[in-house]
């Protein structure tokens, strides 16, 4: 992998991991556009840039890592368990769905869901406005809905945000809980991939790895910061439209 390719993929990972637009879908598409083959070494690279995104969350929410926030992390764990169990059992079945056509259609379906969600969204004090105030019931159902993120093109962030809004969270709180929920999900996925591909790092050039890692961290850190500010003023409609347009482009271009 060339350095400029590593930089682009790092930026794509950082920009899309926490937005409701499917980081996996974008990495598949951009890798194809750049002519990057799915080798074991390149799979190992994707693990590294995902670790960078994880560190960006730690950097943003470091004040949450204390015993006084134990209730919050209990809810994160509850929401994590469904996708952990289902993902582990059906991981081979899920991999069979990784095609451009599947990604494209679920981009479109996800976009329509966001537009419908916003059409039905009613703001107000009845909505949970702080991640510390989530109930175990809300966390559980967010976790159940997040399971749909196993389908390529759905988006983990997208599924958990939709779940949050459906369970009564306001937009900002749904996004923030999605960020924290990404920690155990990404750590589990990255940990498994590291165990599978650790030998492949011996045949990987370290310069592209370092460049990709740095770009992913910076892009993810900035995305989290800007996204939260964005949701204080705007809705998810733009993401719904983007997903539909991107999905249609994929169908025309690749299928």
UniProtKB/Swiss-Prot annotation:
Keywords, A to Z, come to: Antibiotic resistance, Cell inner membrane, Cell membrane, Cell shape, Cell wall biogenesis/degradation, Hydrolase, Membrane, Peptidoglycan synthesis, Transmembrane, Transmembrane helix
- Report whether Transmembrane helix shows up as a keyword of the record: yes
Q: Name one GO cellular component term.
A: plasma membrane
Record EC number: 3.6.1.27
What InterPro entries does the database record attribute to this sequence? Answer: UppP
Q: Which residues cross the membrane?
A: 1-21, 41-61, 70-90, 97-117, 139-159, 175-195, 208-228, 234-254
- Main location class: membrane
- UniProt-listed GO biological process terms: cell wall organization; peptidoglycan biosynthetic process; regulation of cell shape; response to antibiotic
One GO molecular-function entry: undecaprenyl-diphosphatase activity
Instruction: State where the protein is found.
Output: Cell inner membrane
The UniProt catalytic activity note for this protein reads: di-trans,octa-cis-undecaprenyl diphosphate + H2O = di-trans,octa-cis-undecaprenyl phosphate + phosphate + H(+)
Look up and give the membrane topology term.
Answer: Multi-pass membrane protein
Q: Do you know which NCBIfam families this protein is assigned to?
A: PRK00281.1-2, PRK00281.1-4, undec_PP_bacA
Other comment: Bacitracin is thought to be involved in the inhibition of peptidoglycan synthesis by sequestering undecaprenyl diphosphate, thereby reducing the pool of lipid carrier available.
What HAMAP family does the entry give? Answer: Undec_diphosphatase
Q: Which family does it belong to?
A: Belongs to the UppP family.
Please give the PANTHER family that the UniProt record associates with this protein.
UNDECAPRENYL-DIPHOSPHATASE
The record's function comment reads: Catalyzes the dephosphorylation of undecaprenyl diphosphate (UPP). Confers resistance to bacitracin.
Name listed for the protein in its UniProt record: Undecaprenyl-diphosphatase
Q: Which gene encodes it?
A: uppP
């Amino acid at each position: 992998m060339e350095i400029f390719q590593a930089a682009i993929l790092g930026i794509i990972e950082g920009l899309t991991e926490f937005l409701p637009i499917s980081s996996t879908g974008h990495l598949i598409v951009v890798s194809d556009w750049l002519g990057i083959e799915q080798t074991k070494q390149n799979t190992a690279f994707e693990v590294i840039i995902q670790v960078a995104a994880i560190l960006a969350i730690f950097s943003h929410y470091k004040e949450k890592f204390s015993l006084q926030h134990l209730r919050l992390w209990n809810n994160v764990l509850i929401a994590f368990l469904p996708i952990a169990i289902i993902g582990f059992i059906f991981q081979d079945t899920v991999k069979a769905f990784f095609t451009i056509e599947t990604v494209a259609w679920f981009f479109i379906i996800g976009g329509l869901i966001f537009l419908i969600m916003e059409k039905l969204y009613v703001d107000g004090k009845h909505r949970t406005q702080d991640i510390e105030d989530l109930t175990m019931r809300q966390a559980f159902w967010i976790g159940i809905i997040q399971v749909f993120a196993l389908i390529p093109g759905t988006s983990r962030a997208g599924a958990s945000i939709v779940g949050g809004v459906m369970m009564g969270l306001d937009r900002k709180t749904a996004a923030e809980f999605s960020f924290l929920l990404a920690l155990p999900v990404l750590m589990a996925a990255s940990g498994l991939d590291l165990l599978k591909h650790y030998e492949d790092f011996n045949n990987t050039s370290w310069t592209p790895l370092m460049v990709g890692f740095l770009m992913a961290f910076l892009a993810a850190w900035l995305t989290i910061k800007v996204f939260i500010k964005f949701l204080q003023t705007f809705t998810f409609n733009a993401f719904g439209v983007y997903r539909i347009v991107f999905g249609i482009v994929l169908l025309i271009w690749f299928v």
